[in-house]
């Protein structure tokens, strides 16, 4: 059975944080939610784990859901070991199996050498890995990780993704939010959010293939449908008409998300 | 400097709750404390016992408010009424001249009575100060001060417990864990409860040894009272923490609940001397009842039966605080259950 949201709407007063958003998270797979700051990623996570009420739609959530909040959810004044032991105790895990599971997680995350270090003494990468380990410890069917890689150095990001992939391999359904579009390739499916609305969803290939119009590259800007990408400019042509002085290029996910945002803006 | 000042002003103005406290609370506190700050004794609850119980009341000073006049009661009955705190002065009549028994644990009433008796002596009338014969101030203050110290230490410390979780983002972790709201509440206060229990033992022991405060009664009612009082004091801190947006607000709120307990719990100013509305605030404060229990046990040697009312009220306050905190936690930890989907 897949977990997730179906046409879920969440409002805070007059503001709509999520507008009819749907996402499926299959067991053994990683679903990525990508979007800029304020896109609604955290609200989506909080809604999925039951921390926000909904104004419409449906939530499919198992009894046991692991959650790592944006702040990593690590208790600063507990050691790595104490953080994990607390989670094990909270879920009523039996002592011996819990100890074995903790040791496995410490080994997999590379936190074994820091087991007696306080949460506040950990580096950003170690904190996030501990946060994910805490979320995984109770053996949840669904794991929700809110921006676990934000602010991490490239090596830490790689290590964390390796751990996430390993966890998905155990059959867990995992939802990960990120602001980095390059990370979307690590998931089985992707949902692009903007202003609480779904811009595009599906596998990365499907999302890229579904991009309307054509994409061109140029040395200079071409108005509101163009944006800087590295040292050159990308130009979106909604009707796929050639752009003078520009070369057609194949879009990647970052391009498609930007195009989707432009298209949504044009519709509004 | 102008930029810095402007930034600070903006931050202060944006924190509406703190701003309201800064502006409104001084006025409220001045009014409440102003009506509370009185050492004047207007009335002394009095019992008259013995064969002359019906004749003597008319001869007594106006300050002595005779609540009970029992011709069949004895001096032992009078002492029992004083020990239970039912009255603060008893006149024992009999074959000889009447004897006035004064409750020395109610310092200001006892002193007022002594002054009146000295100023306008009634022929043949003698008086005896019970429980605190020297009318020693520290003996009366120390039991209540022990509670006051616990209020400051316990309530302040626990007032930061939940708000700190919220600020560091770990409250969300607790929310998705299979905890019941009461588990979180009890778990929060448990370590502080143990530490504060040790604190109260230390403070009362030092008070007894250093300030010669007697321990005339059984420790059982004192233990029961102290445990109930600690539960309330720490629970108030956790409740404050659950309604505060940040640690600064929590500390301010905790101080706002601690300050009235100094002035309105009867430790410094007698409750009977306060304006009725202010006195009723005092009746809502846990320290009022802990003070009654501690003074009752330590000075008057009161037993469990004598202190049932303050003990029951402490337990009732504990139940109210527990219910409020758990209700608050329920909405914080399980908001999705509160806000129904349509």
Feature annotation, model-predicted:
Chain A
Residues 159-175, 179-237:
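ABC transporter nucleotide-binding domain
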Residues 143-147:
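Catalytic Walker B motif of ABC-type/P-loop ATPase nucleotide-binding domains
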Residues 3-5, 18:
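Conserved structural motif at the start of ABC-family nucleotide-binding domains
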Residues 85, 89, 96-114:
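Conserved ABC ATPase "signature" region
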């Amino acid at each position: 059975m897949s977990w997730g949201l179906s046409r879920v709407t969440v409002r805070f007063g007059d503001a709509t944080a999520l507008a009819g958003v749907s996402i499926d998270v299959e067991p053994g797979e990683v679903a990525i939610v990508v979007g800029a700051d304020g896109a609604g990623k955290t609200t989506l996570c909080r809604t999925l784990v039951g921390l926000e009420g909904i104004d419409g739609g449906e939530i499919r959530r198992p009894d046991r859901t692991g959650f790592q909040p944006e702040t990593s959810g690590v208790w600063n004044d507990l050691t790595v070991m104490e953080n994990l032991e607390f989670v094990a105790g909270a879920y009523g895990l039996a002592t011996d199996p819990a100890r074995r599971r903790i040791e496995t997680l410490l080994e997999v995350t590379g936190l074994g050498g820091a087991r007696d270090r306080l949460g506040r003494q950990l580096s950003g990468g170690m904190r996030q890995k501990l946060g994910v380990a805490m979320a995984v410890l109770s053996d949840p069917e669904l794991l929700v990780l809110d921006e676990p890689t934000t602010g991490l150095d490239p090596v830490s990001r790689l290590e964390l993704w390796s751990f996430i992939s390993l966890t998905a391999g155990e059959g867990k359904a995992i939802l990960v939010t990120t602001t980095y579009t390059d990370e979307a390739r690590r998931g089985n499916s992707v949902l692009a959010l903007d202003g609480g609305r779904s811009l595009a969803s599906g596998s990365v290939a499907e999302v890229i293939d579904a991009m309307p119009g054509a994409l061109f590259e140029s040395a200079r800007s071409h108005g509101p449908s163009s944006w800087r990408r590295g040292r050159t400019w990308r130009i979106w042509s909604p009707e796929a008409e050639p752009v003078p002085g520009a070369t057609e290029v194949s879009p990647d996910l970052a391009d498609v998300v930007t195009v989707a945002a432009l298209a949504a803006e044009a519709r509004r | 400097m102008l930029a810095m000042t402007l930034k600070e002003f903006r931050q202060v103005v944006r924190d509406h709750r703190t701003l309201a406290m800064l502006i409104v609370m001084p006025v409220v506190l001045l009014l409440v404390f102003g009506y509370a700050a009185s050492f004047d004794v207007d009335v002394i609850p009095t019992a008259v016992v013995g064969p002359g119980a019906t004749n003597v009341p008319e001869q007594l000073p106006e300050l002595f408010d005779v609540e009970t006049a029992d011709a069949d009661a004895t001096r032992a009955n009078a002492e029992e009424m004083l020990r239970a705190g039912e009255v603060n002065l008893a006149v024992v009549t009999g074959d000889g001249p009447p004897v006035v028994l004064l409750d020395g644990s109610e310092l200001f009433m006892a002193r007022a009575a002594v002054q009146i008796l000295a100023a306008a002596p009634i022929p043949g009338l003698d008086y005896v100060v019970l429980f605190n014969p020297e009318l020693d101030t520290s003996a009366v203050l120390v039991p209540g001060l022990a509670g006051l110290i616990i209020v400051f230490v316990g309530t302040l410390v626990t007032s930061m417990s939940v708000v700190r979780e919220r600020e560091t983002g770990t409250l969300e972790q607790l929310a998705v864990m299979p905890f019941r709201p009461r588990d979180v509440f009890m778990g929060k206060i448990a370590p502080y409860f143990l530490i504060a229990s040790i604190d109260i033992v230390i403070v009362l022991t030092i008070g007894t040894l250093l300030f010669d405060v007697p321990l005339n009664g059984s420790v059982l009612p004192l233990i029961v009272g102290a445990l109930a009082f600690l539960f309330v004091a720490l629970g108030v801190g956790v409740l404050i923490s659950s309604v505060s947006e940040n640690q600064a607000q929590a500390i301010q709120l905790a101080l706002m609940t601690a300050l009235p307990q100094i002035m309105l719990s009867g430790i410094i100013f007698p409750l009977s001397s306060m304006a009725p509305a202010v006195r009723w605030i005092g009746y809502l404060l846990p320290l009022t009842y802990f003070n009654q229990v501690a003074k009752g046990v330590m000075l008057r040697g009161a037993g469990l039966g004598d202190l049932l009312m303050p003990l029951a009220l402490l337990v009732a306050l504990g139940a109210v605080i527990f219910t409020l905190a758990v209700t608050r936690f329920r909405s914080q930890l399980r908001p999705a259950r509160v806000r129904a989907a349509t």
